[in-house]
Amino acid sequence: MYSIYDFKYPSDWIEPTADDKCIYDCYKEVINYKLLDENKQTFQYYYGTLSSTINFYPLCNYEQLVIACRFLTVGYLIDDFLESNLVDSETSNLMSKKIENILIDGEYLDQSNISNIEKYTMFFRGKARQFVGDKINIFNQFIKFFVEWINSINPFNKAINLNNYDSYNFFKKVNSGTYVTLSMAMLLNPNTKVDTNIWMNPRFERFVCNGAYQMSAFNDCASYAKEVRSNCHLTNPLYFLQKEIGSFDQVYKLILNFNNKIVNEICKDEELLLKECPDDQKDDLKYLTRSMKLILGGNYSWSLKCTRFNDIDSPFIEQRSINPDVIAYENIVDKIIKL
């Protein structure tokens, strides 16, 4: 038996969660847009998944949290649907293209066939654009990362022959969602003095890239049982590295060692970034780098509490559950998107 508590984080990476009112209010929106049926099971799915919002962005106010919750609603519903094996390759590619068209152009790809998730994505895009005011560069940066993440889902799901951890991490750099999640943190603070050119800084790029590696390393463990259940585990290193390294135990130790190394590198790069930063931008850069750490720490604390990853066969003791109220996500998402 293994424990997710084996992952170690600096104490300042984890804060108490923000208020959860945003989740209830966004659930009402989801029901109004007919993305989910209104019942106990869909609420538990939604709350368990979208409680990530109040863990990722624990220091945000209600207005900020609602924007973040809408973003994560779009992201998780699309991700879960595309990963659920409920649609063929042509349909999943069409879905990605439709969402991309909304995010970039603010238009529906096919006016005669608009799904409810497209309508909600358009609604979210409008609210996010309104939130940033005249800071169009911040909005565009966020849209860029969101589209890249959406377009990474199908290729990653098809990458069934992964057998190298370096190649895998190259894939997961985008597919982990870390870049877009941090970009959302910047969008939530549109009056920042930090220019979007920060994303071109090679040290900041390495800082975020290592954050993506860390999130992936942890998520591989947290989601392992869920992926086995839905037959999506072939791209999980806990599975494919056993062919190269040996036992599950050996692979898990390798991932833990990798995690510890990455955490140290993140801390080192943050220190150097702040040292190099102009004084008038330092507070806002601290906000951004701390946001990265809180997203990573929040991802950890959220995964320990939510039912999304629960499975009686999980190798991790914290995730084992026989609670009859816990429902597998793939039994929910088949009703989400009607193309």
From Swiss-Prot:
Name of the protein this chain belongs to: Terpene synthase 7
Comment field on protein domains: Contains several highly conserved motifs that are important for catalytic activity including the aspartate-rich 'DDxx(x)D/E' motif and the 'NDxxSxxxD/E' motif, both of which are involved in complexing metal ions to coordinate the binding of the isoprenyl diphosphate substrate in the active site.
Gene name, Swiss-Prot/TrEMBL: TPS7
Motif position, NDxxSxxxD/E motif: 219-227
Record flagged with keyword Metal-binding: yes
Record family assignment: Belongs to the terpene synthase family.
Induction summary: Expression is detectable but at low levels in vegetatively growing cells and increases during development induced by starvation. Expression is highest during he ultimate stage of mature fruiting body (approximately 24 hours after induction).
Keyword Metal-binding: yes
Highest taxon above the source species: Eukaryota
